[in-house]
Structures are given as structure tokens and as C-alpha cells.
């Protein structure tokens, strides 16, 4: 593919087979007149910038992206409300498949469905009202570049499929969730592992009681909501644990409810604004272990509740 592709009103584009980006920046645009579907049924590769736009319609790629020859950058649905489906991987474990990656905008109301096992990119931002992660164990990876789900007004929920253990690794860069993370009510445990030496920012996790273990490592862990873990299935009857390794910064009132699982905080705990943000830890029968100082830098709010410490 060596030229831009633009359709007429509500026109569609279907590319069947592998797509190699030949030269220059490439844009495929079906957004005219509201939008038409944009479908690629093979793999996409080539050292170029790729921009895909489909307006209110769906953009879908069923093959891998950037395996062999990585894309310089990848932009999908940077205007329009339509959803995005990526059924396979971006890159491989050792090599990123794209540079800077932007999927969706604050206007995106369609679901972004990510079915690949690995999304190895440059700095990556995913924005939509809803996300569905359907692979068995999806891994999002960068080399010292940030990964963000939503930004600005977007606060879409990230839904993990049964047994879709989520792992994000960014070296020393930020990991940011501006919306909630939930599991799927299918009776199979789902774990979350977020790892960076930079800042991890989270809202609510496991509000529907379908998340088992939560393990977060960061230079700073910024919390604003409730982390809930649970026993999810009879086949894995272990209570979900919560482990936070790093300095915990209470951006908002924070609750950890582990329903019998152990809670461990390896680091200090401070309020983002001195004396205003509260912390409640309720582990049921599980142990609570806090190894750092509480309020040493900025005092926590009037409520500090540690049940079964």
C-alpha cells in the first residue's frame, strides 16, 4: 500500500490479505458522510506511519501489526465515534510492532476490543467509553514509555475476559487508568499485574467481584477508588490478594477490600493533599501488612481503618 485511500459517502474498505506499507505516511479514511466499515483481514507491516479512520463505523484488523517490519506510528480512530477491533498482536515480546500508538479518542463511544496476547508498542494511549480484553493473558509492554487507558474526559471501563490475566510493563514510565477495571462473571479467576519504576495511577478495580489477585509495583502508586478482590471460582478457591509495592499516594479516598485475602503494602502511605484523603483496608480473615510509614510526608485524612492488621 503506497497511497492514501479515501472513500465517498459511507463507503467501505475491505483489504483481504497481508498489507505492506510501501512508502510515506499512509491514511485509509472511510469517515466521509458518517463513516463506513474499514476491515483488514491479514497482517499489517512496514516502517511507515499508518492512520485509519472510519467515522461512526467499525475499524477491524484480524492479523498481526508490525511483526517483521514495525510501523513508525499507529493511529486508529483519531476522529469519530466508531469502535475498534484488533484480533491479534502488535509486535512480539522482544520487539515493538509500532512506535507511538493512539487508538480511539475522547469521542469514541464504540467498544475497543483487543484480542491479542501482546501489545508491544511505543507510548500508547487507548481511549473509549468501553474496552474489552479477550485474550487469555494480555501483555502490554513498552520500553520506558507510558501506557494509558483513557485521558481527559474519557473514563471507559476495561473489562477482562475470564482468565484474561492482565499484565502491563513499562520500564520507568507511567501506567495510567482513568476508568475502572473489572472482570467477567464466568467463574474463572482473573489477575492484574502492573509494573513500572514510574507512577501507576488507578481508579476502581474489581467492582463486580470477578478479580482475584492484584499486584502493583511502582515508584509511586496513586489510588482513587476501591480495590476489590474475591474468591472467583471453586476450581481456584484461593482468596484474592492485594500487593502494593511502592509509595502509595492517596489521590482520593481509597478502600481495599480483599474478602479474606492478604493485603501487603511495601512502602509508605501519604495523602495527596495533607489531611484530606482517607484509607480503609478490610481484609476479612486475611492478614494486613504495612511495612512503610503512614502520613510521614503528608498526613492521611481523619479516617484510617486497618481491619485485621
Placement of each model-derived feature along the sequence:
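The right-handed parallel beta-helix/beta-solenoid scaffold, focusing on the short coil/turn
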Residues: 3, 11-13, 17-19, 24-26, ...
